[in-house]
């Protein structure tokens, strides 16, 4: 016989961004804990703004007894081990049997479980599962000792058509739930899951998150098409408004024409970030004076709701327009003094000091680039503008528009706009002068914060230094910047007027670790260790070349040849030079001649960055190395000859090391 379990945790508003994770998390937890208790049920979890619901079908009414054979210690084990096994399973030695396993006798114990009624064990299982899910943040409320994401108001729990009694803190289970908070907030008596879902729907609550999401997507598309407009895909915003609404309905509002003089990004920020509205665009991609929004519930007078949302948006845009007009009345340069009163970091001074360092770094990289140096000087000025003070996500973007209003060079304006890029792995790296400005800004922050001890550790990275380092690495590699990065780091460290050596080493070490992290998505770690240095463009080219070379037959054979040499050498460090007069075979002579021939050539080729040619030249060692080992005994009875042969092999390793650290492959 099987039954159905229905559990609803009814609470105050659950943050929208946590609902999807809670749905997935509780599904895993309940499925696992059921299986551990021999309850093999089909489990579903639904998350919404005010409820987390579990529905389990095919739940057995009775857990049948079973036998499990448990292996213990061997019969030859010390008595203390045997007694410990007995104590752990609450049995005596007389209850044990012996069986032969791998030609050895072991004690065994047959553990028998009793038949159990599922309803007797479910309360503990449910409480354990509720407590097991770890919310990103949770809270206590009142004088109760339970904690959850938001205060729980009710717990519905029905098993096999009856209330399953359990207590969670101060709450006892019942068969009651509630409809939509604004339109149908009344008690609903529930019989089973089908009755539960239908009654919620009748009272303006759609249980399934994915169904609510689909309703929103369809509504957005239909209203956009009705206006002959387009809507850009915004997965994150759709997920967010899905989590804000139990019964979503999409409506269309209009933006007054006077606000369209604002930069498009300002209107989008107000609408998307602050109001959770969707922007519309015409067929040419231009911003349209309309917006879409999602309301929570079915209301009679939607026209009044539209007017209310238009009024709220107009008020926000009026503020933005006021800020914008105030800001363009001042130049970016006139704001520099104000940066002196804004702290970048308590130990690293003001934003004005940071701007000065960024400018110095840009001047160091490109001393003749006037546009870059101007952009560096002005890149943080918009941070003290009214607009960015109100809408921080517009930093850089407003600097671009203010620079354009001042009729500054387009390159200066673009560099100011894009110097925060890339912001995350999915963001594009900047181009043009913004490339070097972004590099300088991120490098200054990273160097300064490492100097004052803010290096990330296992518990956190509050200043996102790992992300900034990856941003720098991507900027250099994707823009193929040929710069001496270690010298640049050294210069940046010197701007802080501190004892530089230890700090320089710390910064370099940090970048090396982040470079390994960056490259390991595409390359084996042994390959990375063989070629990594902070000439990042060079490293990328070496990795590509060596990766391709080592999958070829000649590459595999050459690596094996190197390992034969390396295995003989071990950790020995031979100090003597090779003495050709001590050669007693032609194979020693042939190997030595090839080494002498290619050694200097490889240095020149590597300097010219022709790594494929260097590997091809290195391959000329394959035949003489093979012949040497096939015909020569390294440990000759004459110690001088043996030592000379070791020196020859060391020379061989050194030639390989000019191309890559083959010992790490």
From Swiss-Prot:
Q: Molecular function (GO) terms listed?
A: arginine-tRNA ligase activity; ATP binding; glycine-tRNA ligase activity
SMART domains membership: DALR_1 (SM00836)
Alphabetically sorted, this entry's keywords are: Aminoacyl-tRNA synthetase, ATP-binding, Cytoplasm, Ligase, Nucleotide-binding, Protein biosynthesis
Entry GO terms, CC: cytosol
The highest taxon in the source lineage is: Bacteria
The cellular location(s) given in this protein's UniProt record come to:
Cytoplasm
Catalytic function, reaction form = tRNA(Gly) + glycine + ATP = glycyl-tRNA(Gly) + AMP + diphosphate
Q: What is its main location?
A: cytoplasm
Q: Which residues form the signal peptide?
A: none
Enzyme Commission numbers on file = 6.1.1.14
GO biological process annotation, one example: arginyl-tRNA aminoacylation
| Disulfide linkage | none
Question: What InterPro entries would the database entry show?
Answer: DALR_anticod-bd (IPR008909), Gly-tRNA-synth_bsu (IPR015944), Gly-tRNA-synth_heterodimer (IPR006194)
EC class: ligase
Quaternary structure, per UniProt, is:
Tetramer of two alpha and two beta subunits.
Q: Which family is annotated?
A: Belongs to the class-II aminoacyl-tRNA synthetase family.
> Can you name this protein?
Glycine--tRNA ligase beta subunit
- Source species, please? Rickettsia prowazekii (strain Madrid E)
Q: What does the record give as the organism's lineage?
A: Bacteria, Pseudomonadati, Pseudomonadota, Alphaproteobacteria, Rickettsiales
The gene for this chain is glyS
């Amino acid at each position: 016989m099987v039954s159905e379990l229905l559990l609803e945790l009814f609470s105050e508003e659950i943050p929208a961004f946590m609902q999807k994770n809670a749905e997935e998390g509780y599904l895993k937890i309940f499925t696992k804990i059921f299986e551990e208790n021999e309850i093999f049920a089909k489990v579903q979890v639904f998350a919404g703004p005010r409820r987390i619901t579990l529905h389990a079908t095919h739940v057995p009414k009775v857990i049948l007894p079973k036998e499990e054979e448990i292996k213990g210690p061997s019969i030859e084990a010390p008595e203390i081990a045997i007694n410990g096994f007995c104590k752990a399973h609450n049995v005596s030695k007389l209850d044990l049997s012996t069986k032969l396993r791998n030609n050895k006798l072991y004690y065994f114990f047959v553990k028998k479980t009793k038949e159990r009624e599922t309803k007797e064990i479910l309360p503990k299982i449910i409480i354990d599962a509720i407590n097991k899910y770890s919310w990103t943040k949770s809270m206590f409320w009142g004088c109760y000792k339970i904690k959850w994401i938001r205060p729980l108001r009710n717990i519905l729990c029905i098993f096999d058509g009856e209330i399953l009694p359990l207590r969670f803190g101060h709450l006892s289970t019942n068969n009651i739930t509630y409809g939509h908070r604004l339109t149908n907030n009344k008690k609903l008596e529930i019989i089973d899951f089908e009755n539960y879902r239908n009654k919620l729907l009748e009272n303006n609550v759609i249980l399934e998150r994915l169904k609510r999401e689909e309703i929103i997507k369809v509504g957005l598309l239909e209203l956009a098409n009705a206006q002959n407009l387009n809507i850009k895909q915004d997965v994150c915003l759709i997920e967010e408004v899905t989590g804000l609404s139990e019964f979503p309905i999409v409506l269309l509002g209009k933006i007054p024409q006077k606000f369209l003089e604002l930069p498009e990004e300002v209107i989008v920020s107000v609408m998307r970030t602050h109001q959770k509205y969707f922007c519309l665009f015409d067929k040419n991609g231009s911003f349209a004076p309309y917006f879409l929004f999602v309301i929570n519930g079915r209301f009679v007078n939607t026209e009044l709701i539209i007017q209310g949302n238009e009024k709220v948006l107009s008020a926000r845009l009026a503020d933005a327009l006021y800020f914008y007009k105030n800001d363009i009345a001042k130049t970016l340069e006139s704001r520099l003094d104000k940066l002196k009163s804004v702290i970048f970091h308590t130990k690293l001074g003001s934003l004005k000091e940071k701007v000065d360092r960024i400018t110095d770094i840009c001047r160091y990289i490109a001393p003749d680039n006037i546009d870059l140096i101007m952009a560096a000087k002005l890149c943080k000025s918009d941070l003290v503008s009214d607009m960015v003070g109100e809408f921080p996500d517009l930093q850089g973007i407003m600097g671009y528009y203010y620079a354009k209003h001042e009729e500054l060079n387009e390159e200066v304006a673009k560099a100011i706009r894009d110097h925060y890029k890339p912001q995350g792995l999915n963001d594009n790296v900047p181009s043009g002068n913004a490339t070097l400005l972004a590099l300088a800004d991120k490098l200054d922050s990273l160097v300064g914060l490492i100097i004052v001890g803010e290096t990330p550790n296992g518990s956190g990275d509050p200043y996102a230094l790992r992300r900034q380092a990856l941003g720098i690495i991507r900027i250099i590699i994707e823009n193929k910047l040929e710069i001496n990065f270690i010298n640049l780091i050294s210069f940046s460290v010197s701007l802080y007027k501190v004892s530089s050596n230890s700090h320089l080493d710390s910064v370099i070490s940090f970048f090396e670790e982040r470079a390994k992290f960056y490259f390991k998505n595409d390359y084996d770690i042994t390959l990375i260790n063989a070629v990594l240095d902070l000439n990042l463009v060079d490293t990328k080219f070496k990795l590509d070349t060596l990766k391709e070379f080592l999958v070829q037959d000649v590459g595999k054979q050459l690596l094996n040849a190197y390992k034969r040499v390396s295995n003989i050498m071990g950790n020995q460090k031979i100090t003597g030079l090779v003495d050709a007069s001590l050669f007693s075979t032609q194979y020693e002579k042939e190997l030595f001649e090839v080494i002498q021939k290619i050694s200097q050539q490889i240095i020149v080729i590597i300097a010219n960055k022709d790594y494929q040619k260097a590997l091809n030249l290195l391959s000329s060692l394959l035949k003489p190395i093979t012949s040497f080992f096939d015909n020569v005994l390294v440990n000759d009875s004459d110690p001088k000859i043996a030592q000379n042969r070791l020196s020859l092999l060391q020379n061989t390793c050194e030639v390989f090391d000019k191309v890559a650290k083959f010992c790490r492959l």
